């Protein structure tokens, strides 16, 4: 049986999906005659290979009974505790029961879309934003509304104007997705003043903030910015090991209130039962 975009067997929400341009460029990057600038692929020689070797050895010898077995949907408790310690370093106090491990932050984006978005719901993003986040959300057929940014991050005056326009319509605003540190692709960092105002607006207009923070630890000058999550527990925070350890170890995490996380966990059960316990043990070590 031949399947194409006209097939009546394909779900409507999938029929109009398009591949991310970034992933298409990754596919071309395997050619030996190509020097790829398409994605944030680190130089392998700079990765902590010796530390990874030791961690893999520990996983396969000392903890093989755990590392080679199924795990819990929310992720290994010890790994979550280790990541909670990392979060504490940036000013976010979170408990293991408020964290769920994912297959990279990309799976986290998809889980959030499946958990929260109905067709026609509104998602606010920085314009432009991370293309593959849009790919994750678009599977659930929301309306994506972009808000411009400048050198200080998303323009709060323009955001407030957009919120007022949305309030006059009949569509539901569900969430705002932001990369406040070294925004992708803009590279800008949201100021502390604008972060405070964003949180105020989220309460006034009752929408969720999704804080995607893969780059926050890559700051080499100046002090670290206080995460939105540290200022408001309602914020859903996404982290990843990809940019600070190795992208081949597919470990990301969601920090959210426990009742919200319980809903996301139900969705993850249907997606993959559990993440890679082996990767979790390696990261923990």
Residue spans of the language-model regions?
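N-terminal "arm"/small-domain region of PLP-dependent enzymes with the aminotransferase-like
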Residues: 2-72
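Conserved core of the PLP fold type I
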Residues: 61, 66-205, 216-231, 236
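Short, solvent-exposed loop/turn segments at secondary-structure junctions
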Residues: 40-44, 106, 130, 181-183, ...
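Glycine/Thr-rich phosphate-binding loops of Rossmann-like dinucleotide-binding domains
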Residues: 45-47, 109, 133, 186, ...
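Conserved core segment of the aminotransferase class I/II
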Residues: 231-285
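Glycine-centered flexible beta-alpha turn that most often forms the glycine-rich phosphate-binding loop
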Residues: 212
């Amino acid at each position: 049986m031949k399947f194409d975009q006209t097939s009546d067997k394909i779900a409507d929400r999938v029929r109009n999906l398009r591949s991310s341009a970034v992933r298409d460029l990754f596919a071309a990057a395997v050619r030996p005659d190509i020097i790829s600038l398409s994605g944030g692929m680190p130089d392998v020689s700079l990765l902590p290979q010796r530390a990874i070797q030791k961690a893999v050895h520990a996983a396969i010898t000392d903890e093989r009974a755990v590392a080679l077995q199924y795990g819990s949907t929310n992720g290994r408790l010890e790994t979550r505790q280790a990541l909670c310690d990392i979060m504490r370093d940036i000013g976010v106090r979170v408990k293991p029961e408020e964290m769920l491990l994912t297959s990279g932050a990309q799976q986290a984006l998809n889980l959030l879309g499946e958990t929260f978005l109905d067709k026609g719901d509104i998602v606010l993003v920085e314009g432009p934003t991370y293309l593959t986040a849009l790919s994750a959300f678009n599977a659930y057929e929301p309306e994506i509304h972009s808000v411009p940014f400048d050198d200080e991050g998303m323009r709060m005056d323009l955001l407030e104007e957009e919120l007022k326009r949305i309030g006059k319509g009949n569509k539901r605003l569900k969430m705002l997705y932001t990369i406040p540190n070294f925004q992708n692709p803009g590279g800008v960092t949201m100021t502390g003043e604008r972060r405070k105002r964003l949180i105020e607006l989220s309460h006034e207009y009752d929408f969720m903030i999704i804080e995607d923070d893969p780059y926050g630890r890559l700051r080499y000058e100046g002090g670290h910015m206080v995460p939105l999550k540290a200022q408001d527990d309602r914020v859903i925070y996404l982290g990843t090991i990809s940019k600070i350890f190795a992208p081949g170890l597919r470990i990301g995490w969601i920090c959210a209130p426990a009742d919200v996380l319980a809903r996301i966990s139900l969705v993850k059960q249907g997606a993959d039962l559990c993440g890679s316990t082996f990767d979790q043990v390696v990261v923990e070590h």
